[in-house]
Amino acid sequence: MAVLEEPFKGIRTVKNFIGGEWVESKGELVDIINPANQKVIGKVPMSTKDELNAAVDAAREAFPSWRRTPPLSRVRVLFRLKELMEEHFEELSRIQTVEHGKTIDESRGETRRGIENVEVATGIPSLMMGYNLEDISAGIDEYVINQPVGVFGIIPPFNFPFMVPLWFIPYAIATGNTVVLKPSPEDPTSQVKVAELAEEAGLPPGVLNLVHGGADVANAMLEHKDIQGIGFVGSTRVGRDIVYRKGGETGKRIIAGTSAKNAVLLMPDIPLDKVIPTLLSSFFGNTGQRCLAGANLIVVGEGLSERAHEEFYKKVVDQFVLSASKIKVGYGLDESVQMGPLRDKGKKARVVSFIEKGIEEGSKLMLDGRKVKLVSDLPHDAFLNPTIFSDGSVETTIGREEIFGPVANIVRARTLNDAIDMIERSPYGNASSIFTNNGGWAREVQYRVTAGNIGVNIAIPAPIAMFPFGGKKASFFGTLHPQGRDAIRFFTDTKVVIQRWM
């Protein structure tokens, strides 16, 4: 299959978008690197605190008039934005592939998921309606109204640079708020394109502002008195220890989606040949760089003798290793490629350190992804192939900590109770899945497992725009989640009006 054309040529320096103007930053410029070929494809500024303050000022000044804009008028802009995103669908997808490294199919899926959030947000004029009750006492009526809050800051991660900001932005805008977005500095260009399209769609100046930068800009957002809330997705260390705590100190509303260690349970009644392809996507899709990635594959021997369980376990390991070894790894713009690189050299080095730790702690390395094999001639700097361990446990380092790379840990559980106990010992609770044809077993997992997302014969319980998305335990900090009705509640303030006319 052909290698697709890259979405832009040369080296482009991205700008800040403040108050409806594209502004060059005075901050230091940092390279944006294509992880597949290690070429510099752009420059991103580390913006100054003054530039962040200017963006917040623009958002604050735009809020009163945007708030007074009729909801139907607000969402007409989103309808137009959705149309423009569809027109630029392929460009948006290719930008993600060259900046992040994911395959073009994965990028197209991310683009579709992001656009779906814009679509759902166009329904907010009815979704944010309040309610009322007449005559709560003689001649007295009571109303609940939902009002916009003000300026919100959005701090998304590198791994889904297009989709995750759209878990927040359309809902904030449709409900009458204004936004300051700090894209990931590693892959910011898809959000630059979104801002360009929003401007073309007729979004008024200051409603959406974009300021590039790193931790300094993020910290300034958390400390800024005029930012009313923060939407963040990233690691537990940053989400809990910095965003949630520092944001709470300044009275901000917080959504902080954080780390994960997801388990996939295989019950002995499953048709393994049908499940393996789904498992490959779960564990190695997006090169394992997603909060829904499979991490621990738990092979359950419920109802089997020890010998039969061991045979089932060996069959799973053998088939999974064989199938994973055939995954085509390379440049994501090659449509034959099934897995791209990690985002950068540092992230590869981190994953390699986990592989070495797994070996050191006694797990059996069945497939060594450090032996890089690509479909074309590319530097190996950020590439790994799928890696699989067996004969370990969920208590080892690779079984316990988030790796964020293409590494699977296959373990045994004699019973379903044992498997659930393994899951519950984890500090994380983002997602768990079970593969079975037994409704009782599936219900037991759904009922008992502490996770924000449960998959039944679905290895990736992916975020769908109509529903809230988020985890539990150390995988989430806050009370409301992005997307769906939770997002509407997060971006609105409830006011009760009790009235009597004399």
Language-model features and meaning:
Residues 38, 74, 96, 118, ...:
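Residue-level signal for inorganic ion chemistry
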